[in-house]
A protein has these predicted regions:
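Gly/Ser-rich "nucleophile elbow"/oxyanion-hole loop immediately N-terminal to the catalytic nucleophile
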Residues: 1-11, 27
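C-terminal catalytic histidine-bearing segment of alpha/beta-hydrolase fold enzymes
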Residues: 102-143
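Glycine-rich nucleophile elbow surrounding the catalytic serine of serine-hydrolase chemistry
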Residues: 9-21
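Hydrophobic anchor at the start of a short beta-strand
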Residues: 5, 77, 112-113
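Acidic-histidine catalytic/liganding microenvironments
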Residues: 24
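The feature captures the conserved acid-bearing segment of alpha/beta-hydrolase catalytic domains
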Residues: 38-109
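Structural motif
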Residues: 10, 82-84, 119-120
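A short, hydrophobic beta-strand element of the alpha/beta-hydrolase
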Residues: 30-33
Length: 143
């Protein structure tokens, strides 16, 4: 038996991780790297998945999905954005909604949500910095 189930996703995998963490409360920690913004912050290559997003967004917003993915006892969601990513999901836009999602998560109950901006490179990948953060966070065993 596993103590926790954690999930890491990059790019479209981050989008998928956000959805799975929102609907499956067995996911303790979810790490989304360069793959999902609320629709109002997207630009260029950050296009939605037409059929899936249409169905999904008729029921909730991405901010709701982030709250659902981080809310609950022993649950945490961390979004990591590569500030200088040449592909997509760059900049510091995640910081614009971090406080609102974190506050809503705490208002409902336990859980945490945070955004990290990775300034160490300009590629669309999981950097050494992000990887070391994730491993350190998982090894904290604070649940």
């Amino acid at each position: 038996k596993f103590k926790t189930i954690d999930m890491i996703g990059l790019s479209a995998g981050a989008w998928l991780t956000s959805i799975i963490a929102a609907v499956d409360t067995r996911i303790s920690r979810s790490y989304l790297i360069s793959g999902v913004y609320p629709m109002y912050l997207r630009e260029g290559n950050e296009f939605p998945l037409p059929d899936v997003d249409k169905i999904l967004l008729s029921q909730s917003s991405y901010l709701d999905i982030f709250v659902m993915g981080s809310q609950g006892a022993d649950r945490r969601q961390v979004q990591i954005f590569n500030q200088f990513d040449r592909c997509c999901f760059r900049n510091k836009k995640g910081l614009l909604y971090e406080r609102a999602v974190s506050k809503r998560t705490q208002t409902i109950g336990e859980g945490s949500f945070s955004v990290i901006i990775d300034k160490t490179h300009a590629r669309h990948k999981i950097s050494r910095y992000a990887f070391e953060f994730i491993l350190s966070d998982i090894n904290r065993n604070d649940f």
